[in-house]
Amino acid sequence: MIKTNKKTPKNIILSLENVSISYGTFEAVRNVFCNFKKGNITSLIGPSGCGKSTVLRSLNRMNDLIPNCSLKGTVLFDGTNIYDKRVDPVEVRRRIGMVFQQPNPFPKSIYENIAFGARINGFTGDMDELVESSLRKAALWDECKDKLNDSGYSLSGGQQQRLCIARTIAIEPEIILMDEPCSALDPISTLKIEETMHELKMNYTIIIVTHNMQQALRVSDMTAFFNAVEYEDGDGGKVGYLAEFNSTKKIFNSPKEKTTQEYISGKFG
C-alpha cells in the first residue's frame, strides 16, 4: 500500500483519528479517536445502535459496499491512510481480514474453502501445506483432516466458524476483525473459538465486537465501550461515540465513566 507521511508509535498497528461515519444524512458514529496495539485482542462493546459494528467494518473498508456510507477522519494502518483514493480496498481487506457473525463457508469442499482465497490472491506455494497450517491455527485440523473433500456445509456451526477463521488466516492478514463471531454458537463452540483466539494473538492483532460481557472479559486485553446519545435537534435519533477505552481489567473493575459501569452491570443495553 502507499505510504503517507503520517506516523504512529511502533506498537500501534491501527489508529482512528477523529472518525465520523454516516449513512446518507444519518450520522451513525461521531469523532472517534482510538489506537489499537499490535498483538492485542481488543473488544468493542456497547448497546445496540451505538456504532461499534459500523466502526469495525470501517477498519477494512467493508462499509464501502454499503450505498451512501461515508467516512470523515483518518484510519491509519501501517503508516497508510486506508481511505486515501490511491489505496486499493481489496489489498486492505487482504491485510485486514474479517470473520462475520454468521458462519459463511463457500459452497465448496473444506480444502477449497482455504485454497480458493489463497489462490485468487496469488499464492503459488505448497497448497497442501497452507491448508493444513491454516486449519491447525484455527484448531480444526484434527477434526477434519480425514474429510477435506467434504463440503464445508457438512461441518457443525462452530466448526464452520473456525473454517471461516482458517480461510481468513490463509491469505496472511495482519489483523483479524470479528463481528460477534460466537453469537450464533452454543457454549462449547464459543469456548473453542475463544481458545482459538488466544492462540491466534501470538501472530495476529484481533479486534472483536461482542455483546457478551463475560466473553470480552475472558478474551481481550483492551476494551472500547461505545454508547449513543440523542441528536441535538431532538428528533429521536441517536449517534454513537466512544465513551471509554482502556485495559479490559480497568474497564470492568474501575471504569472512569458512570455509563460504562451501568452498562457492564446490566442496567441498560
UniProtKB/Swiss-Prot annotation:
Residues 14-253 form the ABC transporter domain. It is an enzyme of class 7 (translocase). ATP binds at residues 46-53. GO terms for cellular component: plasma membrane. The complex is composed of two ATP-binding proteins (PstB), two transmembrane proteins (PstC and PstA) and a solute-binding protein (PstS). Belongs to the ABC transporter superfamily. Phosphate importer (TC 3.A.1.7) family. This is Phosphate import ATP-binding protein PstB. It comes from Prochlorococcus marinus (strain MIT 9312).
